[in-house]
Amino acid sequence: MVLISLKRLERNIYYIEIIMTKLTPFHLAIPVKNLSESKDFYENILGCKRGRESNEWADYDFFGHQLVIHVDPNHEGKSHHNEVDGKSVPIPHFGVVIPWDDFDKFADMLSTNNIHFVIEPYVRFEGLPGEQKTMFFYDNSGNALEFKSFKDMSMLFSTKI
């Protein structure tokens, strides 16, 4: 991944900061109630490509990371909630940071597929360091997902609130 940002040294003097990073894909295994229904969600709604599978689990390319869905018919999908920017955020949750210019199209695609948002797409920390678009929804097994996008990707790990 290449992060590019314009930095100001002093009045009318700017430089371009280029940060080269190589992300190591993460692995996440989550419980699902029904394997067939969950395959449909991750493949046909989120567009994830299926890899290896058995009768009890399936691997997915989740935006370059490895997501494994495992059958747990007793999974209740309950979550705790914490307040962030005045919104009740489901905990735990997982997701992906997508490009700023793709966020609205992705949100529209989810709406077209009748995905109910727990937190509707909106801009969080508007005008502040770490300004981002975010949205939360559940998969068909009650696992909370967050998709977000940063206006300035170099602020992904900002310590300023």
Provide a role label for each language-model segment.
Residues 78-82, 156-159:
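A short, polar/proline- and glycine-enriched secondary-structure boundary/capping micro-motif
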Residues 20, 50, 58-59, 83-86, ...:
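Short secondary-structure boundary/capping segments
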Residues 13-36, 93-94, 149-161:
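N-terminal beta-strand motif that seeds the catalytic metal site of vicinal oxygen chelate
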Residues 1-19:
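N-terminal amphipathic/basic-hydrophobic helices that include classical n-h-c signal peptides
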Residues 25-33, 61, 81-161:
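Vicinal oxygen chelate
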Residues 24, 56, 65, 90-92, ...:
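A generic structural signal for short beta-strands and their flanking turns/coil linkers
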Residues 31-76:
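Core segments of cupin and vicinal oxygen chelate
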